[in-house]
């Protein structure tokens, strides 16, 4: 966490040095990210002092996640009559772009509890999460990452049983349904553009390719940019129109849709090394929790986040996801420390 905070500070100075962007403008778009990362130390301390009960937080996430999905689902169905959730909506489809951590985490928590306790009521949370993916979020990559995270959790069940086989079959059926849906058609169109360039005009895949080529070009300008990145650009600063937010047709490139590529553009190879080390530690802790305490959700969740990295770094761009990563780290450290205390 400390390394991520240091990276953010370096990026503020770096962008000022390279294009003259004021330090305050480099800090402004990262303020939520930085403050939430700093909160890790306070939250971790409060958990250690028993001021925060981790199980109460989990139950709160389950409740708030279900409530969020219900509210968003109602908005999707009533979008032609009233708008009470003020978020960006896709023009062509009824897709809401929301800060979705609570909507997604309930599926992993619910499936984990089901695998641990064999209580079917927890599958309700998985179903609710899939409602979010299919009706509200409609993100192909996010859906694929969640399903693969679930699949790994199921395959790691320590008891090979009829129940396990049935759940795997359900997963296969879900994949078949997905392949025959409109979602897959749009996914296939994106692949055609990426690999065969068979569609016309500018779409998101084409914009991403332009962005990534431009990011690489700028990183290679000097050893300093390669190591420390190009800094965090504020879209409100005019100088970024020729660096991070270049126009492509009627659109322009940006950071949000370029995942780990944008992260490396901002923080350089130093940032890439920090993320690699961070995710290694996350995997190591999640695997220990699974092996020692039979807790599945951290591993499935980290796998899902890893798959998303190609296009999406929610934990960097969205406050609830940044907090979610802080919670994940605090949760795993607390559970593993409890195990060490029991051994003593």
Functional labels for PLM-detected ranges:
Residues 119, 163-164, 266-308:
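Hydrophobic transmembrane alpha-helices and their immediate junctions
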């Amino acid at each position: 966490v400390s390394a991520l905070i240091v990276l953010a500070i370096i990026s503020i100075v770096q962008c000022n040095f390279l294009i003259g962007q004021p330090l305050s403008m480099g800090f402004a778009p990262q303020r939520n990210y930085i403050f939430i990362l700093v909160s890790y130390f306070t939250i971790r301390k409060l958990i250690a002092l028993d001021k925060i009960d981790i199980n109460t937080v989990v139950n709160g996430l389950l409740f708030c996640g279900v409530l969020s999905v219900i509210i968003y689902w109602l908005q999707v169905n009533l979008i032609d009559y009233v708008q009470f959730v003020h978020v960006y909506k896709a023009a062509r489809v009824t897709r809401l772009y929301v800060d979705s951590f609570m909507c997604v985490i309930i599926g992993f928590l619910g499936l984990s509890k089901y695998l641990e306790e064999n209580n079917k009521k927890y599958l309700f949370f998985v179903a609710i999460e899939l409602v979010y993916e299919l009706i509200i979020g409609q993100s192909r990559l996010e859906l694929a990452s969640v399903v693969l995270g679930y699949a790994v959790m199921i395959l790691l069940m320590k008891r090979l049983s009829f129940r396990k086989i049935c759940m795997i079959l359900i997963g296969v059926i879900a994949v078949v349904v997905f392949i025959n849906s409109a979602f897959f058609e749009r996914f296939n169109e994106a692949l055609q553009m990426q690999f065969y360039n068979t569609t016309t005009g500018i779409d998101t895949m084409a914009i991403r390719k332009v962005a990534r080529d431009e990011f690489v070009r700028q990183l290679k300008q000097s050893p300093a940019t390669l190591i420390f990145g190009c800094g965090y650009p504020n879209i409100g600063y005019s100088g970024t129109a020729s660096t991070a937010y270049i126009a492509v047709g009627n659109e322009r490139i940006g950071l949000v849709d370029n995942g780990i590529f944008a992260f490396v553009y901002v923080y350089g190879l130093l940032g890439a090394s920090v993320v690699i080390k961070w995710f290694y530690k996350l995997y190591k802790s999640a695997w220990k929790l699974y092996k020692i305490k039979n807790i599945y959700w951290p591993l499935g969740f980290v796998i899902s986040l890893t798959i998303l990295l190609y296009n999406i770094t929610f934990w960097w761009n969205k406050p609830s996801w940044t907090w979610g990563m802080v919670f994940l780290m605090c949760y795993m450290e607390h559970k593993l420390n409890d195990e060490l205390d029991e051994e003593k």
